[in-house]
Regions:
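N-terminal accessory interaction module
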Residues: 25-82
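A generic structural-conservation signal
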Residues: 80, 130-132, 235, 257
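A generic secondary-structure signal
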Residues: 69-70, 165, 221, 225
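Generic structural signal for hydrophobic
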Residues: 70-71, 122, 226, 248
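A conserved beta-strand-loop-helix scaffold within acyl/acetyltransferase catalytic domains
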Residues: 2-44, 84-95, 100-211, 220
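Conserved GNAT acetyl-CoA-binding A-motif
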Residues: 72-85, 226-237
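Aromatic (often tryptophan-rich) hydrophobic motifs at membrane interfaces
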Residues: 171-273
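Membrane-proximal basic amphipathic "stem/tether" segments
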Residues: 1-19, 263-284
Length: 284
């Protein structure tokens, strides 16, 4: 069911950030495995199945087949499936959330006049520095966001694991916008491990130091890196809310893939069901 070559393929062909094995394994501490043409992450009795099949992210039949296989895993107590559609196996009581990924072609379309003005404004006050070092001021900016914002527990956990992720993934990159005196005004984290798709992972800014357009400037640094590496698309992530969605559409980003998350508890299989599965397994 699992092998390093297949997991490497999941990252190489990733269309969504959850398919980047080093990222999810680092922030969640879970065990990656391949289930059909989908990658999953197991932790105890819980499984997260990233139901975007590698050969075609929107293949509903392949998604359903992967869910069927996942539900046969011994000891499974809870499953969370993310994909382009709700899996048919999800019961009516499943917890469901929906969003959509936005993406930009690389090179990105020419920015509109207002965006060009914002970029020029930020360029006058900030210099871009890129690398994979996680400095104290990066950590301080994340901590400030944690203290100031009302964030979901899962988001807080991910933010707390950013240093671990950046160390674990050779495809990660931090683009920082610094003032002339070296102070950090904003930074973005990108992921470039996939062959054709780059990922805009995270962005933070200091409202006291960051001029207008700071977030746009660090994103432009990630887009330039994607262009330099020959990637053809940047997944900007989910819409999340009106403000974040506006930021992405301002760049010309368009809806890329639906995001449907369904989570439910798995009832233990009865004796007859287990016996039937054993017979099928032995005869195949």
């Amino acid at each position: 069911m699992i092998g390093p070559d297949r997991l490497a393929r999941a990252t190489a062909e990733a269309a969504v950030p959850e398919q980047v094995v080093a990222y999810v394994a680092a922030v969640a501490g879970s065990r990656p495995l391949m289930i059909g043409d989908c990658v999953g992450f197991a932790s105890g009795g819980a499984l997260v199945l990233v139901g975007y099949p590698l050969h075609e992210p929107g293949d509903a039949k392949a998604l359903a087949a992967a869910v069927d296989r996942a539900l046969q895993m011994p000891g499974l107590e809870r499953i969370t499936v993310i994909g382009a559609a709700r899996p048919p196996q999800a019961p009516p009581t499943a917890m469901v959330a929906q969003d959509i990924y936005y993406a930009l072609p690389v090179p990105a379309p020419p920015p509109a006049q207002k965006l060009r003005n914002l970029l020029r404004r930020a360029q006058r006050e900030l210099s871009l520095v890129q690398g994979r070092s996680w400095e104290n001021d990066h950590a301080a900016l994340v901590q400030r966001r944690l203290h100031e914002g009302r964030l979901a527990a899962g988001t807080r956990h991910i933010f707390g694991q950013l240093p671990r992720y950046i160390e674990a993934s050779a495809g990660s990159l931090v683009v920082s916008g610094r003032r002339a005196d070296g102070r950090l005004a904003a930074f973005a984290v990108g992921e470039f491990a996939a062959l054709t798709t780059a990922f805009f992972m995270f962005c933070f800014r200091d409202p006291e130091l960051a001029p207008p357009g700071s977030a746009d400037l660090v994103l432009s640094g990630l887009l330039e890196e994607a262009r330099r590496r020959g990637q053809t698309r940047m997944n900007l992530g989910l819409g999340v809310n009106a403000g974040i969605g506006f930021f992405k559409r301002k760049w010309g980003a368009e809806p890329f893939l639906p995001y449907v998350e369904a989570s439910w508890e798995v009832k233990p299989r009865g004796f007859i069901s287990k016996l039937r599965s054993l017979v099928i397994k032995r005869s195949s």
